[in-house]
């Protein structure tokens, strides 16, 4: 499943290709994703211009606004946001030349630039666990969308630090890994990067969240940011289906300290990496380096 780094890599890859372009048309071939695609989406998008491409957690947010100076548009035309979640196998690709759609290519958005050159933003999702949703309105209203309003703080937000984590885990008996995956303390730290961050901080993933000290949370906050930044710089992790918007695979997984390295020697101390199961998810850790 694409995690925060993979979504951010996708955002950065799409940014120069779609911002400032006008949507010529949209084609929805399959409406049955995790949540149904609005049948009116092609009509809602036609003529709007992409002005911003943001990320909130694992959601891509594409701002689409009307060109008010354009003649012939209805006076009540409103802009809004596309909310896109890649699910487990979703990808977004920019096509600069026509490519016939495949079986799993569900949504195409054709965009025109100032020079008239068209590109196509194509959403592909073999397992259909992703989402392409429309939210009419401004950014303030978007923040209250049911899928976004309860998300935790962004890991690169200046407010996110050890004090933030310490204050929000007092009295919690749940294991720290499970607490991080819940997404209400900090958003976007999925299974891969959770194992990696806990290793970098030297914290055993089964430790109760409420028993971790303030200094150790400071180390964990730093480890989370460093791990995610490294993953973004390396193009994310390619475990099964993920590729960036240019079709290239990420390679963070090749340099992982613990993830998917069960039985192999720890890169720091040589102890065999241990694999356990927490909440039906595989966890990897070093029994010597993490305590």
From Swiss-Prot:
Binds 1 zinc ion per subunit. The keyword RNA-binding does not apply. A zinc finger (FPG-type) spans 257-291. CDD domains: EcFpg-like_N. Its EC number is 3.2.2.23, 4.2.99.18. Its cofactor is Zn(2+). It comes from the Bacteria. One of its GO terms (biological process) is base-excision repair. The active site is at 2 (schiff-base intermediate with dna), 3 (proton donor), 58 (proton donor), 281 (proton donor). The keyword Transmembrane does not apply. InterPro entries: DNA_glyclase/AP_lyase_DNA-bd, Formamido-pyr_DNA_Glyclase, FPG_cat, MutM-like_N-ter, Ribosomal_uS13-like_H2TH, Znf_DNA_glyclase/AP_lyase, Znf_FPG/IleRS. SUPFAM superfamilies: Glucocorticoid receptor-like (DNA-binding domain), N-terminal domain of MutM-like DNA repair proteins, S13-like H2TH domain. DNA binds at residues 104, 127, 172. GO terms for molecular function: 8-oxo-7,8-dihydroguanine DNA N-glycosylase activity; class I DNA-(apurinic or apyrimidinic site) endonuclease activity; damaged DNA binding; zinc ion binding. It catalyses: Hydrolysis of DNA containing ring-opened 7-methylguanine residues, releasing 2,6-diamino-4-hydroxy-5-(N-methyl)formamidopyrimidine; 2'-deoxyribonucleotide-(2'-deoxyribose 5'-phosphate)-2'-deoxyribonucleotide-DNA = a 3'-end 2'-deoxyribonucleotide-(2,3-dehydro-2,3-deoxyribose 5'-phosphate)-DNA + a 5'-end 5'-phospho-2'-deoxyribonucleoside-DNA + H(+). Gene3D superfamilies: 1.10.8.50, MutM-like, N-terminal. Keywords: DNA damage, DNA repair, DNA-binding, Glycosidase, Hydrolase, Lyase, Metal-binding, Multifunctional enzyme, Zinc, Zinc-finger. Involved in base excision repair of DNA damaged by oxidation or by mutagenic agents. Acts as a DNA glycosylase that recognizes and removes damaged bases. Has a preference for oxidized purines, such as 7,8-dihydro-8-oxoguanine (8-oxoG). Has AP (apurinic/apyrimidinic) lyase activity and introduces nicks in the DNA strand. Cleaves the DNA backbone by beta-delta elimination to generate a single-strand break at the site of the removed base with both 3'- and 5'-phosphates. Belongs to the FPG family. Monomer. NCBIfam families: fpg (TIGR00577), PRK01103.1 (NF002211). This is Formamidopyrimidine-DNA glycosylase.
């Amino acid at each position: 499943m694409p995690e925060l780094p993979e979504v951010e890599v996708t955002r950065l890859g799409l940014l120069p290709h779609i911002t400032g372009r006008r949507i010529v048309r949209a084609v929805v071939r399959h409406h049955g994703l995790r949540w149904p695609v609005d049948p009116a989406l092609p009509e809602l998008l036609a003529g709007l211009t992409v002005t911003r491409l943001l990320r909130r957690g694992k959601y891509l947010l594409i701002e689409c606004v009307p060109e008010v100076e354009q003649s012939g548009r209805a006076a009540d035309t409103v802009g809004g946001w596309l909310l896109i979640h890649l699910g487990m196998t979703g990808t977004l690709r920019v096509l600069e030349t026509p490519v016939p759609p495949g079986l799993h290519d569900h949504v195409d958005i054709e965009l025109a630039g100032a020079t008239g050159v068209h590109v196509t933003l194509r959403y592909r999702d073999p397992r259909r666990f992703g989402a392409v949703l429309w939210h009419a309105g401004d950014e303030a209203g978007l923040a209250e969308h049911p899928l976004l309003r309860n998300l935790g703080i962004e890991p690169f937000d200046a407010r996110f630090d050890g004090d933030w984590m310490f204050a929000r885990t007092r009295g919690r008996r749940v294991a720290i890994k499970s607490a991080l995956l819940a997404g209400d303390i900090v958003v976007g730290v999925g299974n891969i990067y959770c194992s990696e961050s806990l290793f970098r901080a030297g914290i055993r993933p089964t430790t109760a969240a409420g028993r971790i000290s303030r200094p150790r949370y400071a180390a964990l906050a730093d480890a989370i940011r460093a791990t995610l930044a490294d993953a973004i710089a390396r193009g994310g992790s390619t475990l099964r289906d993920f590729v960036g918007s240019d079709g290239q695979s990420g390679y963070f997984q090749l340099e992982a300290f613990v993830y998917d390295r069960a039985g192999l020697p720890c890169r720091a101390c040589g102890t065999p990496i241990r694999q356990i199961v927490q909440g039906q998810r595989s966890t990897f850790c070093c029994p010597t380096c993490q305590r």
